[in-house]
Amino acid sequence: MKKIFFILLLLICGGGINAQLYTYPEGLRTGLPHNDDFTVRVRTKGGEWKETFEYKVQVDMDRVTDASMVQFDMDEPVEVMVKKNNGMIQQVDIRPYSKNIEYKQVKNCIFFTLDKPQYLSVEFNGDRLNNLHLFANPVETETYKESSEGVMYFGPGTHRPGDLPNNQIRIPSNTTVYLAPGAVVEAKLLVDHAENVRIIGRGIIYKAIRGIEVTDSKNVYIDGITVVNPDHYSIFGGGSKGITVRNFKAFSCKGWSDGIDVMSCQDIDIENIFMRNSDDCLAFYNHRWNWWGGTNHVNVRKAVLWADIAHPINIGGHGDPESEVGETIENLTFRDIDILEQDE
């Protein structure tokens, strides 16, 4: 009887036994630039503090500025400490304000608790350029340690394509691409005339021509990836059907560096994203370039959008004026959207 009671007690009280908090120490070895504006540590409640790697990202085409980004995975409440390493703290804003994050300040540090995964901007003294982007991801449910049949694996470290002139990596049908924590891919991931492709993980696509390009394809799933400072789109879709995006983050600071742009596509499902772009964060078009026809059945929810330049959401603007039957954009739904900036 005592044994049964002990097991029941573990089941009731042992939620923290399997609690997980991952801070990606592999990020220290990628060679990507570090930003020392802030020191960020996280811990489970009452646990030991864990260091994060403060990546340097660039924002705002009008005045390109070095901002900071940290990432970690969590599946239970965590405590966060942010130390400002230059200057005094006079004002603190944690956005989106809809998250209602309360903080405590101790000298040049602030402390706050996150009860669930979410994507935030932490801003000191009204500075929205040299700010901290804090990405608390859900814990990964699927990971890989090496490449195998049907799996393209990118481990910690920097990866460049073999065909450097093209600066792209082509993904065939029926492939899972896994970017491990600490993986940095300096190339566009191209899904062209393919189907049943998944691009997942916690790695980074860094300064590619485009982040992920999906053309004339179907059933493409993207989850957890971060795209940092591409020349052009973070995700581009053309003439494709069934594109799903989850837990996606992106930064850009150049002209025409939109976030997620799709044209002549159907069945687009986007959830839990953070986009800070120097062009439209989300754009939905009809005909453009090599793709014709309408765009329909688009569902966007739980999105944080920050347009340093242009629009958080842009619908229309391109089409086929010579079409005899016309093209339509229809069945678009947007829910739970936070707009942090729009600046034309």
Predicted region positions:
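Generic structural hydrophobic/aromatic packing signal, biased to beta-strands
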Residues: 80-82, 112, 122, 134, ...
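Well-ordered, non-transmembrane segments within structured domains
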Residues: 150-175, 181-183, 188, 228-255
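Glycine-rich beta-solenoid repeat tracts in large extracellular/virion proteins
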Residues: 166-171, 184-193, 207-216, 233-239, ...
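Extracellular "leader-to-stem" segments immediately downstream of a signal peptide or signal-anchor
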Residues: 14, 18-173, 184-187, 193-198, ...
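Sec-dependent N-terminal signal peptides
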Residues: 4-13, 174
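Right-handed parallel beta-helix
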Residues: 174-176, 181, 195-205, 218-229, ...
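Sterically constrained small-residue positions within well-ordered secondary structures
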Residues: 10, 71-73, 113, 145, ...
